[in-house]
């Protein structure tokens, strides 16, 4: 039974890795287009800065999984243990960064709806840029410290309690991001359906809600397994390993879904043959309610272009 288990696991790993390659190619292409348009073709506001950084995190996250699956399918030998630790740490950083960006986007949107006067008049101008820089730096630091104390040098230095403290801090931070994401999303939904003055739908609001929904369905399971791995040192059973592979495929789907969401929301009720990708993305991130007059005006502007 011990001789046949690794072979069966390899066969079971083949299909997920093929799916990661396929979804990875789609996601890399889509996120590269979003990065190009947001980086060089569109004027960036507060939300677009977060979405640009989210697309960058998704692109690099997909690239890591694509390389990992390609090495598995091509049977490329892993150089050494340090490479594994570094590669795993990079994926951790990118996952936490993506979750942090989503929480920041939802919180930013919540503030713009619940405190519109403060948001538009007193909010510091470069808050989004500063927050994105802080998120990247903080994600890198906590992941490097966790790997340093627990996996790479932990047994040599005997830092068991320091490792446990870093694990606790990592888990607490993940829980904090998840709670912030859920509370800000619930506040937006409550304001939309239960407020005295009901908030009107905008394409940006729909884009944010769909992005969060896809993350909760596809991105969260991998984070859940990862959270358990921090505290459970024993090996997975075959069933757990299958679920873990499924969670990896789902998180790849999550990272490649955002450009598809932008395309879907931006092209809804518009004629695709008269739209460029720039127009579609700009429409998906539009933060004004669409009245009939607005749609006529947009159609006139696009016709002139």
Curated annotation (Swiss-Prot):
The keyword NAD is assigned to this record: no
Highest taxon above the source species: Eukaryota
Membrane topology: Multi-pass membrane protein
Gene Ontology, cellular component aspect: plasma membrane
InterPro entries, A to Z: GPCR_Rhodpsn (IPR000276), GPCR_Rhodpsn_7TM (IPR017452), MRGPCRA (IPR026233), MRGPCRFAMILY (IPR026234)
One MF term in the entry's GO annotations: G protein-coupled receptor activity
Function recorded in the entry: Orphan receptor. May be a receptor for RFamide-family neuropeptides such as NPFF and NPAF, which are analgesic in vivo. May regulate nociceptor function and/or development, including the sensation or modulation of pain.
Protein name: Mas-related G-protein coupled receptor member A7
Source organism of this protein record: Mus musculus (Mouse)
Lineage: Eukaryota, Metazoa, Chordata, Craniata, Vertebrata
């Amino acid at each position: 039974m011990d001789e046949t288990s690794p072979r069966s696991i390899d066969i079971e790993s083949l299909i997920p890795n093929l799916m990661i390659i396929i979804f990875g190619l789609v996601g890399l292409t889509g996120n590269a287009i979003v990065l190009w348009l947001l980086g060089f073709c569109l004027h960036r506001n507060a939300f677009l800065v977060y979405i640009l950084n989210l697309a960058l995190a998704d692109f690099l996250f997909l690239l890591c999984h694509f390389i990992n699956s390609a090495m598995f399918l091509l049977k490329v030998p892993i150089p050494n243990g340090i490479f594994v630790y570094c590669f795993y740490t990079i994926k951790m950083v990118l996952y936490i960064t993506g979750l942090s960006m989503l929480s920041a986007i939802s919180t930013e949107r919540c503030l713009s709806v619940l405190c519109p006067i403060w948001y538009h008049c007193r909010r510091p101008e470069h808050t989004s840029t500063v927050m994105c820089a802080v998120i990247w730096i903080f994600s890198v630091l906590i992941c490097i410290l966790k790997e340093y104390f627990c996996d790479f040098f932990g047994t040599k230095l005997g830092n068991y309690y320091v490792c446990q403290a870093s694990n606790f801090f990592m888990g607490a931070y993940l829980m904090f991001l998840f709670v912030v994401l859920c509370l800000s999303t619930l506040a937006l939904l409550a304001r939309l359906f239960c407020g005295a003055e009901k908030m009107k739908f905008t394409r940006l609001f729909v884009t944010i809600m769909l992005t969060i929904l896809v993350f909760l369905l596809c991105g969260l399971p991998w984070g859940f397994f990862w959270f358990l791995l921090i505290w459970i040192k024993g090996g997975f059973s075959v069933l757990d390993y299958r679920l873990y592979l499924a969670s990896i495929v789902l998180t790849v789907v999550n990272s490649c879904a955002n450009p598809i969401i932008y395309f879907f929301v931006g092209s809804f009720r518009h004629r695709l043959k008269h739209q460029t990708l720039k127009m579609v993305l700009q429409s998906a991130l539009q933060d004004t309610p669409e009245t009939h007059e607005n749609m006529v005006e947009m159609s006139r502007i696009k016709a002139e272009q």
